[in-house]
C-alpha cells in the first residue's frame, strides 16, 4: 500500500503493564479529539495509565512535526488502537495446599495523528 500524500504520523507503545480493557477506556476517550485538547484531558485524568498514553501521544506529535513537517496546531487523533500483548501467568497459594493462577495482562497502544484540512 503506497500513499502519495502522507499527512499522518504514528507512534506506538508496546508491552504496557495494564490490561487492554483498562487502556481502551482512555484510548476511546481521546479518539477523534484535537491533540491540544487531548493533552489537557490526559494531564488531569485520574487514570494511572493516562501518563503512558500522554507520552505516546507526544511522541506521535513529535514525529508529525520533525519527520513530516506538519502543523501541530491542526493535528487530530484519528486512530487510537489498543492491542493485546503477552500475558504473564503467576501462581497464588490458597488454602489447603491449592493454588490459583493469576494473569498479568500487557497491552500495545498505537496512535495515529492526522493534519486536519481547513475548509
From Swiss-Prot:
Gene Ontology BP term (one): translation
CDD domains: Ribosomal_L22
One Pfam family per UniProt: Ribosomal_L22
Keywords: Ribonucleoprotein, Ribosomal protein, RNA-binding, rRNA-binding
PROSITE patterns: RIBOSOMAL_L22
SUPFAM superfamilies the record matches: Ribosomal protein L22
Cellular component per GO, a single term: cytosolic large ribosomal subunit
GO molecular function term, any single one: rRNA binding
Keyword Transmembrane helix among UniProt keywords: no
NCBIfam families assigned to the protein according to its UniProt record, in alphabetical order: rplV_bact (TIGR01044)
Record note on quaternary structure: Part of the 50S ribosomal subunit.
Protein's job: This protein binds specifically to 23S rRNA; its binding is stimulated by other ribosomal proteins, e.g. L4, L17, and L20. It is important during the early stages of 50S assembly. It makes multiple contacts with different domains of the 23S rRNA in the assembled 50S subunit and ribosome.
Family: Belongs to the universal ribosomal protein uL22 family.
HAMAP family with a match to the protein in the record: Ribosomal_uL22_B (MF_01331_B)
UniProt name for this protein: Large ribosomal subunit protein uL22
Gene name tied to this protein: rplV
Amino acid at each position: 500500500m503506497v500513499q502519495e500524500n502522507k499527512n499522518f504520523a504514528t507512534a506506538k507503545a508496546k508491552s504496557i503493564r495494564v490490561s487492554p480493557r483498562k487502556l481502551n477506556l482512555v484510548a476511546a476517550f481521546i479518539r477523534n479529539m484535537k491533540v491540544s485538547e487531548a493533552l489537557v484531558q490526559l494531564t488531569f485524568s485520574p487514570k494511572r495509565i493516562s501518563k503512558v498514553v500522554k507520552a505516546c501521544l507526544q511522541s506521535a506529535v513529535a514525529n508529525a512535526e520533525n519527520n513530516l513537517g506538519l502543523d501541530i496546531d491542526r493535528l487530530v487523533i484519528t486512530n487510537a488502537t489498543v492491542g493485546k500483548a503477552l500475558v504473564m501467568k503467576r501462581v497464588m497459594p490458597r488454602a489447603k495446599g491449592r493454588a490459583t493462577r493469576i494473569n498479568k495482562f500487557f497491552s500495545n497502544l498505537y496512535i495515529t495523528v492526522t493534519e486536519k484540512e481547513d475548509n
